From Swiss-Prot:
Source organism superkingdom: Bacteria
Keywords: Cell cycle, Cell division
A GO cellular component entry from the record: plasma membrane
Biological process annotations from GO: division septum site selection; regulation of division septum assembly
Function of the protein: Prevents the cell division inhibition by proteins MinC and MinD at internal division sites while permitting inhibition at polar sites. This ensures cell division at the proper site by restricting the formation of a division septum at the midpoint of the long axis of the cell.
InterPro entries recorded: MinE (IPR005527), MinE_sf (IPR036707)
Descriptive protein name: Cell division topological specificity factor
Classification via NCBIfam families: minE (TIGR01215), PRK00296.1 (NF001422)
Species of the source: Vibrio cholerae serotype O1 (strain ATCC 39315 / El Tor Inaba N16961)
Classification of source organism: Bacteria, Pseudomonadati, Pseudomonadota, Gammaproteobacteria, Vibrionales
UniProt-listed Pfam families: MinE
Annotated family: Belongs to the MinE family.
Length: 87
């Protein structure tokens, strides 16, 4: 290592920048004690659209819940009641 390389700042990779930003977002969410992420309604709608491609389903048949279990554990639970196949 030359003396110039020692004083020249290291160029950050995009992965390290993305990781750093993600850590900031996660820390901010934890500090806000947000009970559920803001994207849950859109997530439920997207899941409902995908299921509707294959099965006729009512929106009330899909339940999505989010729970905090401790400081570093979050649980996303998805319950889908599928209709009975009529033959």
């Amino acid at each position: 290592m030359s003396l110039l390389e020692f004083f020249r700042p290291q160029k950050k990779t995009s992965a390290s920048v993305a990781k750093e930003r993600l850590q900031i977002i996660v820390a901010e969410r934890r500090s806000q004690n947000d009970p559920a992420p803001s994207y849950l309604p859109q997530l439920k709608e997207d899941i409902l659209k995908v299921i509707a491609k294959y099965v006729a389903i009512d929106p009330s048949m899909v339940e999505l819940s989010f729970e905090h279990k401790g400081d570093d554990i979050s649980v996303l639970e998805l319950n889908v009641k599928l209709p009975d196949d009529e033959k």
